[in-house]
C-alpha cells in the first residue's frame, strides 16, 4: 500500500508522482491486458454510478464493446444513439484508458456546455479514484478542467466555443451531444485545422438526434453515404438490454408517442416511423 505522502495532494485514491510501486508478476500481466484492450480495462477496473445501486463495476453491453472496436479501427467516428444508452459513459472510460496507457497524448472533451464537459471529466476522475495504483501512472495535476499524468498524457474539458482548443495539439477530440451545439458549423470550421494538422488525430462525435439541417446531421448523413471520412455507428433503443416492445409500450404510455420518437427513435428525418 502506498504511503500517504505519495498520494496526490492527500487524496488517498490518486497516485502521486513520488509513489514507487513494487510490481508483482500478476500486476505486470494485468497491466499488459489492460493496455492491450479498452474492453478488458473498462470491465475489470472501471466503476460507475448506478441510479439504484450506487458505485458498481462497469459491465459493457455488446454494442459498447463493438463501439470500442470501432474507435480503435477508425480515425473519424460519428455515433447516433438513443437517449440513455450509455454512450457518454462508454466514451469516458475509453478516454481514460487511452490517457493511462499511452504516453504524451492529449485528449479534449468538448460539450455544448462547459458544465457538461466538466461533468464528464468528473466521471473520469471517479473512475481514476477507483482503479488500483499499479494502473495509475501518477498524477501531476487534477482539477475541474483537466487531468495531467506522469506519463505526460492529459485530458482537457471545455465548452464548444470557437477558441476552446485553438493552439492545442490534440490526439483525440471528443464532441458530445453535437447535434445540440449552438453555432456548430462555426465551431467545426474553426476546429478542423486542429483535427487535420495530425495524421493520426482521432475524432469521436456522439449525439442523440435533433432534427435535420444541423452540422451533426450533415456529418452523419455524409458518413452513411460515404462522402466524408467519418464512419457511422448507431445505437437503437432495442440494442439496450431490457428494452423490448413491452418497454416501448410502457414508455409511450408514461410519456407520449412524440416524446418517444424524439428520445429513442434516432430520427434524422422530418417524419419518423
Indicate where each model-derived feature is located.
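Phosphate/NTP-binding elements of NTP-utilizing enzymes
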Residues: 2-273
Amino acid at each position: 500500500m502506498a504511503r500517504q505522502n505519495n498520494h496526490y495532494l492527500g487524496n488517498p485514491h490518486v497516485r502521486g508522482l513520488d509513489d514507487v510501486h513494487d510490481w508483482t508478476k500478476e500486476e505486470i500481466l494485468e497491466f499488459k491486458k489492460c493496455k492491450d484492450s479498452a474492453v478488458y480495462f473498462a470491465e475489470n477496473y472501471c466503476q460507475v454510478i448506478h441510479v439504484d445501486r450506487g458505485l458498481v463495476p462497469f459491465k459493457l453491453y455488446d454494442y459498447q464493446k463493438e463501439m470500442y472496436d470501432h474507435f480503435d479501427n477508425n480515425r473519424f467516428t460519428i455515433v447516433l444513439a438513443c437517449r440513455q444508452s450509455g454512450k457518454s459513459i462508454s466514451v469516458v472510460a475509453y478516454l481514460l484508458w487511452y490517457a493511462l496507457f499511452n504516453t504524451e497524448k492529449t485528449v479534449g472533451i468538448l460539450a455544448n456546455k462547459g458544465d457538461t464537459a466538466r461533468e464528464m471529466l468528473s466521471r473520469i476522475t471517479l473512475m481514476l479514484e477507483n482503479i488500483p495504483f499499479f494502473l495509475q501512472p501518477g498524477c501531476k495535476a487534477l482539477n475541474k478542467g483537466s487531468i495531467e499524468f506522469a506519463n505526460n498524457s492529459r485530458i482537457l474539458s471545455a465548452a464548444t466555443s470557437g477558441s476552446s482548443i485553438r493552439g492545442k495539439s490534440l490526439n483525440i477530440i471528443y464532441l458530445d451531444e453535437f447535434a445540440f451545439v449552438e453555432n456548430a458549423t462555426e465551431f467545426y470550421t474553426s476546429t478542423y485545422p486542429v483535427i487535420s494538422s495530425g495524421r493520426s488525430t482521432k475524432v469521436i462525435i456522439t449525439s442523440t438526434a435533433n432534427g435535420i439541417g444541423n452540422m451533426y446531421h450533415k456529418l452523419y448523413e455524409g458518413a452513411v453515404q460515404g462522402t466524408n471520412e467519418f464512419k457511422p455507428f448507431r445505437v437503437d433503443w432495442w440494442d439496450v438490454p431490457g428494452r423490448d416492445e413491452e418497454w416501448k409500450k410502457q414508455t409511450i404510455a408514461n410519456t407520449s408517442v412524440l416524446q418517444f420518437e424524439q428520445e429513442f427513435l434516432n430520427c434524422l428525418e422530418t417524419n419518423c416511423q
